[in-house]
From Swiss-Prot:
Keyword Cytoplasm: yes
Name of the protein in question: Tubulin-specific chaperone cofactor E-like protein
InterPro entries: LRR_dom_sf, Ubiquitin-like_domsf
Organism: Caenorhabditis elegans
Function: Acts as a regulator of tubulin stability. Involved in microtubule-dependent neuronal function. May be involved in tubulin acetylation/deacetylation pathway.
Keyword Ribonucleoprotein among UniProt keywords: no
Transmembrane segments: none
Gene3D superfamilies membership: Ribonuclease Inhibitor
Annotated region (Ubiquitin-like (UBL)), positions in chain: 324-415
Location relative to the cell: Cytoplasm, Cytoskeleton
GO CC annotations, alphabetized: cytoplasm; cytoskeleton
Region of interest (LRRCT), ranges: 254-295
Length: 432
């Protein structure tokens, strides 16, 4: 063991166990629902083991590992210093219930030089290990139940001479951040998993997607995630339209869509890819598809260059009339007349429709010479209708009342009736 490094067993004890060494002796097995990880480990019922980035370079006491971690089903040992396949063999042998193993970003020997036991793992994470195809093939041969393989942050050699399938059980492959520039490099990896269903190639500088013969040999491939790639042309999506088995597509955050609105992104992708059933995690209903296909036709009607799918959709829906654009945003100004017979006011002005009715009355105050507190306001519309403003309308903005050019405001001054105080009666005066 190198100076400064630790063993897996020692790290496990330090993180999950007390200092009492007797704790690893035989303990009566009981139910452990709700126990802390420390207690779970001490009672040999720990199921989740997280020892990533702890400078582990070897296993340590394998018997102790078997005792403490016999019920572990998920182990995260990523970002350590494990390099020997004998240590991987020890993990697989002594963790019989292991289902998920992360040994990513460990400096594993590129050649397997130790016999590995058959394991029941169903997910293996090998991110950043840079293992050649031959080594992957040998490793996965002892993992007959693996269905999910993580190989992100790896560099792959297009000239690798291993042409045989790496695994026939893997259904999901993660190839994120692998530096892929060409689609052929992606297919060079994916083709080695003939029963693959889902492929992730996120955050690669990939600029295009190209249909090729290898795709036809992958009949179960139905999910593709291209998030944060560098795809910048519709040609790639036209190529995807030829990959008819892919019905679930994720393409958020790609340059191609940057200049489009959310509505345009949705409709132009669905309209282009007739076989899609799910886009960016949302199911596509039959109503959504028809709406998108009609949008697609209208979008390209006036453009000289029309995509391949355009004719197919014209045959399906026919030539569509262009939709009339109706601006429903509120007007900001109107040209109106201000009328006040008492003050002989009759003038045409341009008013803002943003202020409230009360604020507008305050604006009219000096113009018509009627105090806003004594003002009665009417709206005379050009079509002959008349609206009067009550106190309940005072806090509403003017645009709420659909004021149009040519309408008039009539201002009247409220008549304030004052009552005179009755003079004191002579009787009351004399009695006092």
């Amino acid at each position: 063991m190198e100076e400064g490094c630790s063993t897996l067993v020692r790290s496990l004890e330090q993180k999950y166990l007390d200092d009492d060494e007797d704790i690893v002796q035989d303990i009566i097995f009981t139910g452990f629902t709700g126990c802390s990880p420390c207690k779970m480990a001490s009672q040999r019922a720990l199921e989740l083991l997280v020892l990533n980035n702890m400078n582990i370079d070897t296993i340590g006491d394998s018997e102790k590992l078997a005792t403490l971690a016999s019920h572990v089903s998920e182990a995260d040992l990523g970002w350590n210093q494990i390099s020997k396949w004998s240590d991987i063999a020890c993990i697989l042998k002594n963790l019989p219930h292991l289902r998920v193993l992360n040994i990513g970003h460990n400096p594993l020997n590129p050649v397997i030089d130790h016999e590995l036991p058959v394991s029941t793992l169903h997910t293996i994470i090998l991110n950043g290990t840079h293992l050649p195809f031959k080594t992957l093939q040998s490793f996965l041969s002892v993992l007959p139940k693996v269905t999910e393989l993580h190989m992100s942050d790896n560099q792959f050699n297009d000239d690798d001479d291993c042409d045989e399938p790496i695994s026939t059980t893997v259904r999901t492959v993660h190839l994120n951040r692998c530096g892929f520039l060409k689609w052929s490099s992606v297919m060079n990896v994916v083709k080695r998993f003939p029963n693959v269903c889902s492929v992730f190639v996120c955050e690669n500088p990939l600029k295009d997607v190209t249909h090729c013969k290898h795709f036809e040999q992958l009949p179960f491939w139905n999910f593709l995630n291209l998030a944060k790639t560098s795809i910048d042309s519709w040609d790639s999506l036209d190529q995807l339209n030829r990959m008819t088995s892919i019905s679930d597509l994720r393409v958020p955050n790609i340059p191609l869509l940057d200049a489009l609105t959310n509505e345009e992104r949705l409709h132009l992708i669905i309209g282009r890819l007739h076989h899609l059933r799910v886009l960016n995690g949302s199911k596509i209903s039959s109503e959504q598809r028809e709406q998108s296909e009609r949008f697609f036709i209208r979008y390209y009607q006036e453009q000289k260059e029309k995509p391949l799918q355009y004719k197919t959709l014209i045959d399906k829906h026919g030539n569509l009339e262009k939709l009339v654009t109706i601006d429903l945003t509120p007007k900001k100004e109107a040209v109106v007349k201000i009328l006040c017979e008492e003050k002989e006011v009759n003038q045409e002005i341009t008013i803002s429709l943003e202020p409230t009715v009360l604020d507008f009355m305050k604006i009219l105050d000096p113009k018509v010479g009627v105090k806003f507190t004594r003002m009665k306001l009417f709206l005379l519309r050009e079509d002959g209708r008349t609206d009067d403003f009550s106190s309940s309308d005072y806090n509403m903005p003017l645009h709420y009342f659909k004021i149009e050019d040519g309408d008039s405001f009539l201002v009247q001054e409220k008549i304030i009736v004052t009552r005179r105080r009755r003079p004191p009666s002579s009787t009351s005066s004399s009695s006092s």
